[in-house]
Amino acid sequence: MFGGSFFSSDDDGFSMMSQLRSAFHNNVNQRFDTRYRCYPVAMIPGEERPNVNYGGKVILPPSALEKLSRLNVSYPMLFDFENEAAEKKTHGGVLEFIAEEGRVYLPYWMMTTLSLEPGDLVRVINTDIAQGSYVKLQPQSVNFLDITDHRAVLENALRNFSTLTKSDIFEILYNDQVYQIKVIDVQPDDSRHVVSVVETDLVVDFDPPIGYEESLQKNKQQNIAGVQGTMVTKIGYDELVRQGDSNLMKGTGTKLNGKEVAEVPKINLLDVEKQECPAPLILPLGTYFFGYPYKAPSIEEDSKKDPNLFKFEGAGTSLRASRKTNGTMGKGSSDDPIDIDA
């Protein structure tokens, strides 16, 4: 009953459990660490995909998905991207697994950050990154201020990103214009200075865009120049007119008989004064100004007028001699109608 076969079977069971435990332990400790030849997403066969180029996710080959599945890497899959030759590093996610074997396609801004050229080697390592709660960004151009709703534009753009790394300058596309934005600060912060922006509530703050102070100074100078006056003031037109008027008709006159012309007082034809803007006309509500004082006619003056005063007075004229009737015809009136013979 308790022969050697029983103990042999028990030993096999312990051996199998030990192997499973060892395999699980190895998978937990292992990580995805592979090197690929990198290329910009613009070189992906097929139609252009702006959401890939202006985002923070890469495209890996199908073999990467198989290996990540064996390692039980949890979602979201986040990675370190490292250029070992230049000792530069950034972070991001993965969008699809459709690249050719041995290749990885990166957004152009990510290749610029890592100082990579097409065909260079890049190291890809899976990692865990804490979810972010706060980021501070700085647009790299004052053109970003032309966007009316920054929050909506940025919220839509960050859907194409998985992480944000401090000091990175990423790119977004809006209304066919590319905007560069630098990550100034992230919270929570660690030694890697990176946060995850996947399924998290993120507070976003902005620093003034680069060139904003110069733009304000330029606008201020333009406003000061406008207050000082127009081109007439700038060229000193008033002084030029006075000088020209004083230099007119210089010399002495001579009569035909040789006598000198008596000096006459000079007449200043132009008296140019500095033109200033008229003071604003401030009137009470409901009051109108017609440019001159208005005097309403009095009622007494209208009553003094003679109501029987004839405005038109004269005598009628007939085209032929009319029949004489008894009585005297009144002035300006006729008892007989005007007859016209056919």
UniProtKB/Swiss-Prot annotation:
Keyword RNA-binding carried by entry: no
A cellular component term, taken from the record's GO annotations: cytosol
Cysteine pairings via disulfide bonds: none
Signal peptide start and end residues: none
Disordered: annotated span: 303-342
Gene Ontology biological process terms in this record: ERAD pathway; ribosome-associated ubiquitin-dependent protein catabolic process; SREBP signaling pathway
Keyword terms of this UniProt record: Ubl conjugation pathway
Gene3D superfamilies noted in UniProt: 3.10.330.10, Ubiquitin fusion degradation protein UFD1, N-terminal domain
Organism domain of life: Eukaryota
Single GO term (MF): SUMO binding
Tagged with keyword Amino-acid biosynthesis: no
Function of the protein: Functions at a post-ubiquitation step in the ubiquitin fusion degradation (UFD) pathway. It is required for vegetative growth.
Family label: Belongs to the UFD1 family.
Protein name: Ubiquitin fusion degradation protein 1
